[in-house]
Amino acid sequence: MLDWRLASTHFILAMIVMLWGSGKAFSVDLASQEFGTASLQSPPTAREEKSATELSAKLLRLDDLVSLENDVFETKKKRSFSGFGSPLDRLSAGSVEHRGKQRKAVDHSKKRFGIPMDRIGRNRLSSSRG
């Protein structure tokens, strides 16, 4: 089965090489002849010339607008924030805490940090066993 596939593949490749060498396979001459006859059939009319000039004018205008937009749009300068080691881009400053939102200062002195208690209220580490 493998020998039959190998033989058929070699046969197909040999046919492609022979046709390629004779110039009959993948001929470029036909495409160039069709293009040449289409361009010689009739000269462009005034309407086609007008639309071509309008299109070129629009393209030039768009190109000018794009270049103006690229000139106007510049990256914003970087600012350094106190408390941070490296300067941040102004566009990414939204991730930093806003100064308008101030959080309440939590008074930690009211909380008692001691030995953990269980639900009943006794110390988990009791001195008596049992």
Swiss-Prot record:
Cite a single GO MF annotation: signaling receptor binding
Q: Which Pfam families does this chain map to?
A: Musclin
- Which coarse location class applies to the principal site listed for this UniProt protein? secreted
Example GO BP: cell surface receptor signaling pathway
**Do you know what upregulates this one?**
Is regulated by nutritional changes. Is up-regulated dose-dependently by insulin. Is down-regulated dose-dependently by forskolin. Induced in muscle following physical exercise.
- Homology family: Belongs to the Osteocrin family.
Keywords, A to Z, come to:
Amidation, Cleavage on pair of basic residues, Developmental protein, Differentiation, Hormone, Osteogenesis, Secreted, Signal
What range does the record give for the signal peptide?
Answer: 1-25
The reply to whether Signal figures as a keyword in the UniProt entry is yes
Cellular compartments annotated: Secreted
Q: What is the lineage of its organism?
A: Eukaryota, Metazoa, Chordata, Craniata, Vertebrata
Q: Tell me what gene encodes this.
A: Ostn
Q: In which tissues is it expressed?
A: Expressed in skeletal muscle and to a much lesser extent in bone, brown adipose tissue, spleen and testis. Not expressed in neurons.
Q: What happens when the gene is disrupted?
A: Mice grow normally and do not display any visible phenotype but show reduced physical endurance. Mice do not show skeletal deformities, differences in bone density, growth abnormalities, blood pressure nor body composition changes.
Q: Name one GO cellular component term.
A: extracellular space
Q: Indicate where the modification Arginine amide is found in the sequence.
A: 129
Q: Which protein are we looking at?
A: Osteocrin
Q: Which species does the entry assign this protein to?
A: Mus musculus (Mouse)
InterPro entries named in the record = Osteocrin
Reported function: Hormone that acts as a ligand for natriuretic peptide receptor NPR3/NPR-C and promotes bone growth and physical endurance in muscle. Acts as a regulator of osteoblast differentiation and bone growth by binding to natriuretic peptide receptor NPR3/NPR-C, thereby preventing binding between NPR3/NPR-C and natriuretic peptides, leading to increase cGMP production. Required to enhance physical endurance: induced following physical exercise in muscle and promotes cGMP production, probably by interacting with NPR3/NPR-C.
Q: Subunit composition? A: Interacts with NPR3.
